[in-house]
Amino acid sequence: MDSDMDYERPNVETIKCVVVGDNAVGKTRLICARACNATLTQYQLLATHVPTVWAIDQYRVCQEVLERSRDVVDDVSVSLRLWDTFGDHHKDRRFAYGRSDVVVLCFSIANPNSLHHVKTMWYPEIKHFCPRAPVILVGCQLDLRYADLEAVNRARRPLARPIKPNEILPPEKGREVAKELGIPYYETSVVAQFGIKDVFDNAIRAALISRRHLQFWKSHLRNVQRPLLQAPFLPPKPPPPIIVVPDPPSSSEECPAHLLEDPLCADVILVLQERVRIFAHKIYLSTSSSKFYDLFLMDLSEGELGGPSEPGGTHPEDHQGHSDQHHHHHHHHHGRDFLLRAASFDVCESVDEAGGSGPAGLRASTSDGILRGNGTGYLPGRGRVLSSWSRAFVSIQEEMAEDPLTYKSRLMVVVKMDSSIQPGPFRAVLKYLYTGELDENERDLMHIAHIAELLEVFDLRMMVANILNNEAFMNQEITKAFHVRRTNRVKECLAKGTFSDVTFILDDGTISAHKPLLISSCDWMAAMFGGPFVESSTREVVFPYTSKSCMRAVLEYLYTGMFTSSPDLDDMKLIILANRLCLPHLVALTEQYTVTGLMEATQMMVDIDGDVLVFLELAQFHCAYQLADWCLHHICTNYNNVCRKFPRDMKAMSPENQEYFEKHRWPPVWYLKEEDHYQRARKEREKEDYLHLKRQPKRRWLFWNSPSSPSSSAASSSSPSSSSAVV
């Protein structure tokens, strides 16, 4: 009913617009975007094309479509009626062409054949059925000109013909055909919501101008303009690539545990029951146990062990005056709580004392973790007797021992353990000291608790108590706390060089490190120190082209799994070193740190173009591909500025990079050409309009008076006898 009223309204011009073109060029999508305000999702864009026609009766059954058909163009109220058609060449479209006011002829910029059919098939057909109707040429699917065609083709159905880059038509191709046919040319994208209003507003203008020639008495058509020029579409600026840091290397606990089974670079021999020898590593034992830390810092050549306040050294966490005493006091309180929770059991020191060959008896512990200060005796050479210093140890001394893997003699520390310590439970304790974990299925939990008490490893006592109380799930938090504490202790040992067994000679100095930690965290280091190389048997390793700041960052990463920056750190040199050591996770962390710094500098209005040019080829050569992609993006999106400031450097780029710049530069070349053409055409249009306005006579005669016109009233007053008005 409302649709009939549109035809009856005297000042509403009803425009019939027929949309034609090949199949799958986007005719129906374009109509739906105008009539229904429909948008196209990525899924719909890539879906298999199904031939459809938008029904004209939507104007009768849908009030929203009818409301959207009404518009005002150049002060003229119009009602636009869109007619969709099939694109098959054999279809009979004479009914659709009947009484059409304007024809919109569509082709796809990704299908050259559809543009060829514009001249050979569609335009002749239009002129045959409606020779007086104006025609508008429209290039659809503009978004494919800047889309990632590889991703588009992957997402399409398997048998669909892929879109090739050389098939994408530049704007001048469509403009040439339009100029040859003498019709306006526009481009649209339903995905980008560009050009839809331009197409139909100018189609309305073309129809109204054609109608004005026949219905010259309609004064409201006097100010209708000819179809306007379309400003070129600037593709959206591509977002910078996101630096993705992969998950850190797994099996962080497996590698230290493997060092117990395969004691590479071992420097400690633990002797149990005079016959069992277990090889271990100072750095792992001392960073997991305060007792072992004090033990390995003892002076074995001079002086006498005084008491609990002079154990020969203090733990890395106990180095700050009064906080040292507070730490021991706090530690004892926690030890008492752990002992109470685990029932404070202990194993008799010998089977004979417990009553022959029966099982080991349990008795309440009397040490409670307090160091005894009765002094120690001395062994011949470098060594000490420790039985009065701790119940866990008998003696410690340095001696030449055969390496279990290389079979070469070298100096090691030999520690004889108390006879009550059994090999099986002690290995479980060592596994905890290396990994922070305790197997719930361990059978000798009592003996493990006994050893943990002797070594004052109260967290392990707590874990045993949790298992006995069926609360093993609580051990996960203890393990996490273990790793946090050991990470802090390892960092202090790295800073002070405590227990180091290798020194790296660098360009600007030396830095001490620990082979066991390096072997368990880096395959490259494991191959160097564990293989048939000179570095495996020497305490000094030369690292050329490496600075202390870079090596310190690498060591902290290998020791703690975290990246730590410093003011004197060179990002690119660190990436080079990390790539040499086959550490892709550290490379990614450094890439992220570098990109963050560059983006912060950009926000502070600092020019980073020169740095990006330097980083680009270095990053590509040293496998920092994410940083290289970011540099490529920055250069492409600032291409003109970079070329203006660094012309020689840009010309010296590799052919691959130059090809990438030409393909992905923003704004693209086709846009710059279109912008230049648009500005020239706009100036020509303004000049034509000025000349046209200048040629028009200033006084025109009308058939009736126009009392509202000031010029007519002036003319009437000057010539009262005249029956006409001049405007």
Swiss-Prot record:
Source domain of life: Eukaryota
Gene Ontology annotations for the cellular component aspect, listed alphabetically: cell projection; cytoplasmic vesicle; cytoskeleton; endosome membrane; plasma membrane
Binding site for GTP: 21-28, 84-88, 140-143
Effect ascribed to mutating Y284D: Results in severely decreased interaction with CUL3. No effect on interaction with MSI2
Record PTM: Autoubiquitinated by RHOBTB2-CUL3-RBX1 ubiquitin ligase complex.
Family of this protein: Belongs to the small GTPase superfamily. Rho family.
Effect on the protein upon substituting R161M: In DEE64; uncertain significance; may affect splicing; no effect on interaction with CUL3; no effect on interaction with MSI2
Name this polypeptide is given: Rho-related BTB domain-containing protein 2
Pfam families (UniProt xref): BTB, Ras
Region described as Disordered: spans on this chain: 304-333, 703-727
Entry-linked PANTHER family: RHO FAMILY GTPASE (PTHR24072)
UniProt KW Transcription regulation keyword: no
Region (Rho-like): 1-210
GO MF: GTP binding; GTPase activity; protein kinase binding
Species: Homo sapiens
Phylogenetic classification of the source organism: Eukaryota, Metazoa, Chordata, Craniata, Vertebrata
Gene assigned in the entry: RHOBTB2
Variant or mutagenesis effect after changing A449C: No effect on interaction with CUL3. No effect on interaction with MSI2
